[in-house]
């Protein structure tokens, strides 16, 4: 009996040992698995556009490279200089984050080696944390490394493929992260950085005159040029660009905020960015103006296609600004007597040398690029500075001088002088006239005046010719002076001085209207006899960088002033 009892005890012990060994083989694996949705806190952050880029840089084919400027003739008297640049504007994250949290999100877990889907769950994002809300809110994972993918409702899912259309590209967000799940009974944390799937493009206009009512469209150049969708393989993390599709997006520009006349440049930018799929080729985009004005030119119908020399494709989560600088197409008088635009000059890739800016084609009138007399001031006359009238065309009313365009006659015709003898353009008694008459453009080595420019004479401009120039170069309004009820002496007249400066600086000359302090006084050929003695008309280009020019009627003819020669060219 005792022997049987001992054997029975031994049998029970062996059975218990075998059972324990069996539990060691199976149960620990099940016990070590983790419900990812409970053991792990999934933190969610929404990244700004360009979060991974140096946002102070522009780019062409690669990240951080400078964009190459492209010049496009719009065919309406305006030239556009285009560059593409990363949008450096930072937006407030609070409001967008609240909006993005009001959405449904899906999280997928993948084996990074086999790319097998290990689980999925849907939920919401609240206060930066993903919370499952689906009927099966669990993802059971064994300890190990996994790739987690989180995306919002703007995707269409088919198995592992997540497809987003261009229409949803601006609101589609995707995050991917790798994390090693442990069996330790501690709260674990995984961070998602959600980024825009698409790219955003704004258009910024810059000009030397304020914009009014500008509208337009940003569209594809054809029906297949711009990707209509992209598909993300969540198992491998790779993108596939979909087929091309036609697109057109309306663009409305905010008005120029700068004060009229007082700013050096004026800007208008689209209120919202236009969304595109990543890898969109910028050369396939076309900007067409449907309304608005600048430089007194209606922009409707003008269009441009940005076509850089190297391929430039948009990045996911990239925000860009297509900068379009609208330049007035100034006309130049060349050293051979022909007229042409900047692209025909050596400063714009052409072969011709500019010597003057054309201010009136109907009057065949142009203004020199530089001051006469080597840039030094001189007096109007060395003779009696007070009581002698020298011009037959002197006027009693200053307003009559505003339309008088007889500078050539006053400079070169003896019959224009009171004595019927003096040719002021050759007389040392009239230094301002002689300086204008002696003016010769500074030309590059080997370049000479040819054709109809040989023997052509320059002259001291009249007040009326100055008015023509200020109206043509800086859109001054002559009516501001002709309708003025007070004394014109010392009157400030508004114009876009920085625009006028560009006419000179873009062809290598100095600024005419600005950059000097307190201002430059320019002699005219005109005289005013509104009292018992004559006055000489002088204009002041007020500065620094001011909005106005100023009319003066000098008491003395021996006041110092600068000379800017004008010329009447031949057709």
List PLM regions with ranges.
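Short aromatic-cysteine micro-motif
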Residues: 353, 359-459, 463-476
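Residues within well-ordered beta-strands of beta-sheet-rich folds
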Residues: 149-151, 202-204, 366-368, 457-459, ...
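A motif-centric signal for short, conserved binding hotspots located
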Residues: 272-275, 433, 437, 441-447, ...
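GGW-centered surface loops in extracellular recognition modules
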Residues: 313-375
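Sec-type signal peptide cleavage vicinity
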Residues: 2-8, 18-332, 352-354, 385-414
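C-terminal, surface-exposed recognition/capping segments
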Residues: 464-571
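Short consensus segments that form the blades of beta-propeller domains
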Residues: 93-99, 448-452, 553-556
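Extracellular/periplasmic catalytic domains that process cell-envelope and extracellular macromolecules
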Residues: 141, 195-196, 358-361, 450-454, ...
